[in-house]
């Protein structure tokens, strides 16, 4: 059986980490694409040379032409620029929207049957733009956010309780940013909801609130520590979990930026919600009932995403006709 082809669009820190993980997990052959000549070729060769040591068989190719995407089963998009000091939100949107338009055109032409995972920030707006630009079905285009945000929440909780991360489940909804909504009552340790653990004296509500805040600012914390960029190991690992669920039809229930058309009262927008990912892409959107503060926080998060999408429509009106 022929191996799947995984196209990585953008060969920076996340792209390189993605390529290495695809090899280690033997998910398929890898094409690394970037507009910078030599970078994807060099990284692809470097990772390929690690395969005899780690014992995985996969072909790694670097390319500067979208033709290399031809027939890809999965495309993971990290292309774009990070927000730099002094750069306004609209500056960032303007640059990365152009990138999404180019990438979308490349995917449309060469990989129309792919499952597409967007990682480029601002995530919820970029995945919306990418879907408009490539024209692929909504269930085949998603954004990587919730898996990462939930992983951060799970790690902080496991650290707090001194238990295995495997026994912690966490639930994060909403946009990928400081308005995300970590849902405490749906997060558990070995099936025991966090509010019960507070009653049991494992932690306090105040401490839980601190962990929720730290989760919201998880990305910024790493940016401030690194000073030269943003997180790449955990984001790449999160995207690979999504790709693996698609390629192997695992039907995992994971939070992703998914297209909503009425679910959660949201229309024509990508927002972080739990979904089932299988061989057909997003096979089901899991719609839970939100009330009180959770609903309020979710609506606020959706409002923040809507603001970004409206800004995108003004900057790149051509996307609406795509």
Curated annotation (Swiss-Prot):
<comment type="similarity">
    <text>Belongs to the LDH/MDH superfamily. MDH type 3 family.</text>
</comment>
<feature type="binding site">
    <location>
        <position position="83"/>
    </location>
    <ligand>
        <name>substrate</name>
    </ligand>
</feature>
<feature type="binding site">
    <location>
        <position position="152"/>
    </location>
    <ligand>
        <name>substrate</name>
    </ligand>
</feature>
<feature type="binding site">
    <location>
        <begin position="119"/>
        <end position="121"/>
    </location>
    <ligand>
        <name>NAD(+)</name>
    </ligand>
</feature>
<keyword id="KW-0816">Tricarboxylic acid cycle</keyword>
<dbReference type="InterPro" id="IPR015955">
    <property type="entry name" value="Lactate_DH/Glyco_Ohase_4_C"/>
</dbReference>
<dbReference type="InterPro" id="IPR036291">
    <property type="entry name" value="NAD(P)-bd_dom_sf"/>
</dbReference>
<protein>
    <recommendedName>
        <fullName>Malate dehydrogenase</fullName>
        <ecNumber>1.1.1.37</ecNumber>
    </recommendedName>
</protein>
<dbReference type="InterPro" id="IPR001557">
    <property type="entry name" value="L-lactate/malate_DH"/>
</dbReference>
<feature type="active site" description="Proton acceptor">
    <location>
        <position position="176"/>
    </location>
</feature>
<dbReference type="GO" id="GO:0004459">
    <property type="term" value="F:L-lactate dehydrogenase activity"/>
</dbReference>
<keyword id="KW-0560">Oxidoreductase</keyword>
<dbReference type="GO" id="GO:0006099">
    <property type="term" value="P:tricarboxylic acid cycle"/>
</dbReference>
<feature type="binding site">
    <location>
        <position position="34"/>
    </location>
    <ligand>
        <name>NAD(+)</name>
    </ligand>
</feature>
<dbReference type="Pfam" id="PF00056">
    <property type="entry name" value="Ldh_1_N"/>
</dbReference>
<dbReference type="InterPro" id="IPR022383">
    <property type="entry name" value="Lactate/malate_DH_C"/>
</dbReference>
<feature type="binding site">
    <location>
        <position position="89"/>
    </location>
    <ligand>
        <name>substrate</name>
    </ligand>
</feature>
<comment type="function">
    <text>Catalyzes the reversible oxidation of malate to oxaloacetate.</text>
</comment>
<feature type="binding site">
    <location>
        <position position="121"/>
    </location>
    <ligand>
        <name>substrate</name>
    </ligand>
</feature>
<keyword id="KW-0520">NAD</keyword>
<dbReference type="GO" id="GO:0030060">
    <property type="term" value="F:L-malate dehydrogenase (NAD+) activity"/>
</dbReference>
<dbReference type="InterPro" id="IPR011275">
    <property type="entry name" value="Malate_DH_type3"/>
</dbReference>
<feature type="binding site">
    <location>
        <begin position="10"/>
        <end position="15"/>
    </location>
    <ligand>
        <name>NAD(+)</name>
    </ligand>
</feature>
<dbReference type="GO" id="GO:0006089">
    <property type="term" value="P:lactate metabolic process"/>
</dbReference>
<dbReference type="Pfam" id="PF02866">
    <property type="entry name" value="Ldh_1_C"/>
</dbReference>
<dbReference type="InterPro" id="IPR001236">
    <property type="entry name" value="Lactate/malate_DH_N"/>
</dbReference>
<feature type="binding site">
    <location>
        <position position="96"/>
    </location>
    <ligand>
        <name>NAD(+)</name>
    </ligand>
</feature>
């Amino acid at each position: 059986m022929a191996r799947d082809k995984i196209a990585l669009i953008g060969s920076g820190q996340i792209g390189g980490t993605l390529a290495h993980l695809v090899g280690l997990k033997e998910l398929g052959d890898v094409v690394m694409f970037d507009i910078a000549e030599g970078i994807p070729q060099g990284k692809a060769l470097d990772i390929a040379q690690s395969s005899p040591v780690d014992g995985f068989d996969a072909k790694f190719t670097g390319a500067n032409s979208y033709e290399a995407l031809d027939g890809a089963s999965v495309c993971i998009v990290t292309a774009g620029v990070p927000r730099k000091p002094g750069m306004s939100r609209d500056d960032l949107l303007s640059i990365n929207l152009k990138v999404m338009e180019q990438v979308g055109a490349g995917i449309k032409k060469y990989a129309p049957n792919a499952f597409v995972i967007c990682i480029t920030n601002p995530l919820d707006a970029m995945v919306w733009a990418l879907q408009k630009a490539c024209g692929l079905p909504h269930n085949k285009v998603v954004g990587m956010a919730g898996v990462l945000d939930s992983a951060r929440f799970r790690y902080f909780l496991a650290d707090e309780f001194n238990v295995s991360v495997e026994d912690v489940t966490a639930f994060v909804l909403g946009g990928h940013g400081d308005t995300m909504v970590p849902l405490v009552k749906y997060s558990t340790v070995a099936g025991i909801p966090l509010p019960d653990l507070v009653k049991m004296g494992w932690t306090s509500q105040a401490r839980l609130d601190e962990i929720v805040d730290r989760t919201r600012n998880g990305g910024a914390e790493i940016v401030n520590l690194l000073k030269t960029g943003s997180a790449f190991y955990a984001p790449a690992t999160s995207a690979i979990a999504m790709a693996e669920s698609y390629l192997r039809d695992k039907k995992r229930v994971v939070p992703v930026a998914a297209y909503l058309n009425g679910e959660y009262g949201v229309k024509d927008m990508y927002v972080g919600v739990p979904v089932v990912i299988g061989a057909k892409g997003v096979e089901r959107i899991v719609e839970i009932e939100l009330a009180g503060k959770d609903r309020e926080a979710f609506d606020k998060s959706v409002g923040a995403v809507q603001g970004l999408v409206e800004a995108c429509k003004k900057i790149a009106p051509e996307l609406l006709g795509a």
